Amino acid sequence: MTARLRVRALVLAAGLAFGIAGCSPLPVRTVTIGDQPWTVYEGSANGMRGLPGFGDVDGMLFDMGRNVDPAAVGFGMEDVGYPIDIAWFDGSGALVSTASMAACEAPPCPVYRADGPYRWAVEGRVGAFSDMGPEDRLVVED
């Protein structure tokens, strides 16, 4: 089994476990982006799939645990019925890139990737990252 297939299998298994366990409500934490505090869900392999929207939180945070190659890990919108914006940050919190992800209710759905290695990804409402610049940083405290 190739490394890419192993990663996909692990993501699928984690997603199935999340769905079966019904881990709702999702854990919530606060991070800072630029000078703004954000209340975020802690992301899972399912991301926003099956959720009606962000509700009372600002977004969803994904921690890869270390900087990862964007060619190996991408984000998709399958079964998400609304558009989402995403920002990727490296291990020091520096902005790597942003993208707008279109809603996709049925495959095939595009895969969105950062422009460079990243540790953190934050999904937010459309327009959430439109004013971000290279000086804006993500701060995640343990």
Question: Where in this protein do the model-derived segments appear?
Answer:
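C-terminal motif of bacterial Sec signal peptides marking the signal peptidase cleavage site
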Residues: 19-22
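Bacterial N-terminal signal peptides that target proteins for export
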Residues: 2-10
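Compact, glycine-rich, soluble single-domain proteins
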Residues: 24-142
